[in-house]
Amino acid sequence: MTYYDFRNGLQRINSILYQEMDEEESRRIPSESQMTYSNGYTTWVSSIFVDIRNSTKLFANEDREMVTRVIRSFVSEVIEVLQSDDFDEIGIRGDCVYGIYSTPKIKDVIEVFNKATYINSLMGLLNRQYRKKNYPSLKVGIGLSVSEDFVVKVGRKGTGINDRVWIGRAVSEASNLSSYGNKSIYGPIVMSDNFHYNLIKYKDNGCKDEWFRYASINGKTVYHCNVTNSYFDDWIERNVRP
């Protein structure tokens, strides 16, 4: 039976709403041990979300073994690409895999973009393998965003149930943009205006203007592309038969 102590609940709500909060700036996303229920950190964050297109149809397929093998292989290899020394959080939300990174420098933002191009190439490898077993191919949308966000710890003190919440644009925007990738006019990779600006700010970073196409989503400027990792593509062509 559900039980909720109203009086204690009201006290907890008021303690959260009226307590003093310390806000600190940090070049890196703070560790779990640095976070409390009364502080928060402002830091530059980049986020990448990888969202499967038409996942409802896939999950409704009666061949559960096939669906399991496809999803497990997809999630496993996307996570492998997302891992790095600078990641703060890698997770799974339904049919979506995401990564959140400390990106205080432009080179860090470029590295997150590189992960997106690897994943775009990875889909070619996965789909070749799926076709060999007569499995359906996957398409994904990849959303990218960067912003100076505020990270706070939330949960219920004393229960061990807690997590960090990202207040700002990077996480929510990347999640939203991933839903547009590989749909309609959009390429697989869709990024925020600020993320794109960081990629092309310095011409010697390897990114080229002609890779990206301008678009507007709900009045906001975004850019999209279909860039892959050429080294990965070459390896696939040499080593994996179609």
Task: List where the protein language model places each region.
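Intrinsically disordered, glycine/charged-rich C-terminal tails and inter-domain linkers
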Residues: 1-31, 182-242
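Structural signal for well-ordered, non-membrane alpha-helices
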Residues: 75, 79, 120-127, 178
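Catalytic-core segments of nucleotide cyclases and related cyclic-nucleotide turnover enzymes
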Residues: 153-178
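Catalytic strand-loop-helix junctions within cyclic-nucleotide turnover domains
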Residues: 102-108, 142-162
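Catalytic/regulatory signature loops of cyclic-dinucleotide turnover enzymes
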Residues: 145, 169-194
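Hydrophobic alpha-helical membrane-association signature
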Residues: 70-74, 115, 119, 173
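Catalytic NTP-binding/metal-coordinating core of nucleotidyl cyclase/transferase enzymes
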Residues: 33-111
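Short helix/loop segment flanking the catalytic signature motif in cyclic-nucleotide metabolism enzymes
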Residues: 63, 92, 97-138, 144
